[in-house]
């Protein structure tokens, strides 16, 4: 962290601007495409101030200047010659799936970086730097923002950390249950990512600000729904049934970051939280995801991005910006030069499409609106002469625009056979990207017959499964114990309530281990059809993960005095456990054990015992 003895102003961090400006001046001497400037902006300009941004909040004038430098470089402007900024900066800084380019805005990035220091302050309680700050500035609980009100005696470093805590961290703090002594039952975020008061039926408990989770937990029975029911909805109660307190190991309640799937704080998730667009807009995520997946060079993708944002400088767009007196096409003189006219309907481009698009598809191809036309063709992975149609389509659009610009500005763009040229260029591009890009290259698959296999002599196999109708939604789990002959040793179904699919899977594992331990089985082979859950059980999970309380309970059984082997299997080998999980939806809430085979499961048990298999294509 910087040690500053004077008041911060724009001169304090002037060196950052000098470094960025000097780097840009060297690049401007080189001929760079828009895609090249974008790469440098994201990789270098956005990363140069990161160290300073991670330790202190920079003055707003510095942040504005950093954004200005990035903007002017990205669009190719210089002091001598200004260029049109085709898309507004806020759009450029939005995520790619929302139609942006993923460039980081300086102010939001600064706050996201400094908030990471604030998160560490809450997590690293015994670190020396944490102890010093806690003692000097009387750090309190994150729930109480009174200690975060700025004071004149604060240092610039602590003032920055406090702003990160107040404006970022406090909005994303959640809790993972342990012993329930710290979680405020009604006001903390620990179920569904929201306080229970925001999910209740409108009434407010009198002591809601002081009641902790342990106060409403009955050891050996679960939640005290007699006290909870009057203030909660049915959905909330179903979600509570999927959560338990750990009073056995004595694990404490832990902080979790609600804006990431694993509960761990990241600068990326904090930045996304700060820049989320809450204004209702059409969902264009599928369109732009499709656009960025096309196998073409980055310069073609960035042109497609301009097309998707309707920011290409056609005569219609130039006329709208008062840069041209007419919006008529300068090539055919036959109509308004709109985006669709340039890319498809102008005779200069139409001749190429007629020769490339099969006759049977031409009616639909030439009748669609701009976005429908782009989406259907950029997402078309069908082959055309061994090349995906999406690649050929994008290449034709790109070269059509280049040829058009060359014609208007008098450049020599002669090509004897343009259709042959674009096809050959598409083949070259596709082969280059197929050789260098791992994304999309799938491993070969072969068909194999998959079925349940009995355990070795002396072992009992436990198959478990979980199901969620909605993820999160109504959830259940099931499991079965069988010996080396395939005989039924016991089974269970669990109607959980409401939770996610991974949580349901873990409940199945927990009760499978519990069931086997109660039956005093010395050697267990646990089979689960979720690779994620197998990974949690074998390698562990961070304490901030939303499912860590369940993983800890499962590890409690794994550490007992017995042998447990954990194996991942395909669902075709786990059909009986899946059947018991789905059977639980027809039962009342809670755990149901079966010493005898339920009638609905007898056929599945018989098929497994007889060695029935089903085909599945698996990776080599």
Curated annotation (Swiss-Prot):
<keyword id="KW-0378">Hydrolase</keyword>
<feature type="binding site">
    <location>
        <position position="505"/>
    </location>
    <ligand>
        <name>Mg(2+)</name>
    </ligand>
</feature>
<dbReference type="InterPro" id="IPR026960">
    <property type="entry name" value="RVT-Znf"/>
</dbReference>
<feature type="binding site">
    <location>
        <position position="578"/>
    </location>
    <ligand>
        <name>Mg(2+)</name>
    </ligand>
</feature>
<dbReference type="InterPro" id="IPR044730">
    <property type="entry name" value="RNase_H-like_dom_plant"/>
</dbReference>
<dbReference type="InterPro" id="IPR012337">
    <property type="entry name" value="RNaseH-like_sf"/>
</dbReference>
<dbReference type="Pfam" id="PF13966">
    <property type="entry name" value="zf-RVT"/>
</dbReference>
<feature type="domain" description="RNase H type-1">
    <location>
        <begin position="456"/>
        <end position="586"/>
    </location>
</feature>
<keyword id="KW-0479">Metal-binding</keyword>
<keyword id="KW-0540">Nuclease</keyword>
<keyword id="KW-0460">Magnesium</keyword>
<dbReference type="Pfam" id="PF13456">
    <property type="entry name" value="RVT_3"/>
</dbReference>
<dbReference type="GO" id="GO:0003676">
    <property type="term" value="F:nucleic acid binding"/>
</dbReference>
<dbReference type="GO" id="GO:0004523">
    <property type="term" value="F:RNA-DNA hybrid ribonuclease activity"/>
</dbReference>
<dbReference type="InterPro" id="IPR036397">
    <property type="entry name" value="RNaseH_sf"/>
</dbReference>
<dbReference type="GO" id="GO:0046872">
    <property type="term" value="F:metal ion binding"/>
</dbReference>
<feature type="binding site">
    <location>
        <position position="529"/>
    </location>
    <ligand>
        <name>Mg(2+)</name>
    </ligand>
</feature>
<feature type="binding site">
    <location>
        <position position="465"/>
    </location>
    <ligand>
        <name>Mg(2+)</name>
    </ligand>
</feature>
<keyword id="KW-0255">Endonuclease</keyword>
<protein>
    <recommendedName>
        <fullName>Putative ribonuclease H protein At1g65750</fullName>
        <ecNumber>3.1.26.4</ecNumber>
    </recommendedName>
</protein>
<dbReference type="InterPro" id="IPR002156">
    <property type="entry name" value="RNaseH_domain"/>
</dbReference>
């Amino acid at each position: 962290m910087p040690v500053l003895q004077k008041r911060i102003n724009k001169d304090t961090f002037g060196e950052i601007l000098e470094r960025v400006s000097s780097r840009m001046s060297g690049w401007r001497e080189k001929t760079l495409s828009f895609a090249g400037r974008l790469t440098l902006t994201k990789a270098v300009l956005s990363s140069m101030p990161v160290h300073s941004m991670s330790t202190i909040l920079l003055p707003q004038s510095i942040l504005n200047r950093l954004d200005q430098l990035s903007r002017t470089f990205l669009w190719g402007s210089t002091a001598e010659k200004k260029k049109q900024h085709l898309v507004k900066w806020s759009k450029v800084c939005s995520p790619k799936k929302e139609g942006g380019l993923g460039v980081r805005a300086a102010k939001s990035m600064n706050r996201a970086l400094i908030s990471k220091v604030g998160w560490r302050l809450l997590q690293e309680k015994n670190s020396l730097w944490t102890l010093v700050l806690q003692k000097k500035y009387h750090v309190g609980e994150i729930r109480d923002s009174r200690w975060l009100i700025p004071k004149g005696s604060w240092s610039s470093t602590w003032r920055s950390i406090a702003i990160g805590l107040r404006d970022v961290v406090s909005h994303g703090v959640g809790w993972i249950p342990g012993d329930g002594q710290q979680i405020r039952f009604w006001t903390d975020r620990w179920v569904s990512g929201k306080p229970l008061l925001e999910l209740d039926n409108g009434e407010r408990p009198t002591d809601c600000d002081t009641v902790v989770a342990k106060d409403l937990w009955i050891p050996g029975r679960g939640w005290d729904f007699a006290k909870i029911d009057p203030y909660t909805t049915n959905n909330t109660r179903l979600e509570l049934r999927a959560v338990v307190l750990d009073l056995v190991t004595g694990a404490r309640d832990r902080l979790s970051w609600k804006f990431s799937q694993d509960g761990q704080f990241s600068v990326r998730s904090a930045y996304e939280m700060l820049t989320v667009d809450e204004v209702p807009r059409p969902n264009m995520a599928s369109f732009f995801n499709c656009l960025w997946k096309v196998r073409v060079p980055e310069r073609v993708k960035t042109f497609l991005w301009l097309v998707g944002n309707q920011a290409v400088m056609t005569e219609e767009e130039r006329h709208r910006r008062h840069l041209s007196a007419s919006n008529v096409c300068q090539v055919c003189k036959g109509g308004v030069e709109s985006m669709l006219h340039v890319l498809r309907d102008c005779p200069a481009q139409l001749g190429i499409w007629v020769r490339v698009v099969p006759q049977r598809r031409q009616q639909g191809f030439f009748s669609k609106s701009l976005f429908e036309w782009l989406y259907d063709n950029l997402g078309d992975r069908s082959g055309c002469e061994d090349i995906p149609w999406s690649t050929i389509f994008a290449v034709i659009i790109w070269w059509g625009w280049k040829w058009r610009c060359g014609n208007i500005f008098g450049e020599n763009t002669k090509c004897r056979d343009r259709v042959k040229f674009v096809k050959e260029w598409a083949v070259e591009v596709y082969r280059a990207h197929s050789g260098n890009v791992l994304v999309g290259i799938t491993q070969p698959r072969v068909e194999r017959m998959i079925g349940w296999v009995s355990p070795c002599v002396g072992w009992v196999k436990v198959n478990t499964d979980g199901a969620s109708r909605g993820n999160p939604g109504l959830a259940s789990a099931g499991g079965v114990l069988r010996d080396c002959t395939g005989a039924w040793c016991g089974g269970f179904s669990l109607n959980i309530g409401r939770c996610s699919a991974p949580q349901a899977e873990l409940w199945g594992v927990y009760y499978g281990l519990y069931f086997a331990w109660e039956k005093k089985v010395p050697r267990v082979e646990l089979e689960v059809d979720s690779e994620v859950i197998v990974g949690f059980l074998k390698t562990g999970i961070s304490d901030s993960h939303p499912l860590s309380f369940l993983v800890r309970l499962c590890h409690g059984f794994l550490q007992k005095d017995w042998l447990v082997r954990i194996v991942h299997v395909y669902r075709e080998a786990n059909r009986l456990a899946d059947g018991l999980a789905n059977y639980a939806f027809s039962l009342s809430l809670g755990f149901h054990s079966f010493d005898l085979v339920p009638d609905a499961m007898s056929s599945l048990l018989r098929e497994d015992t007889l060695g029935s298999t089903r085909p599945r294509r698996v990776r080599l």
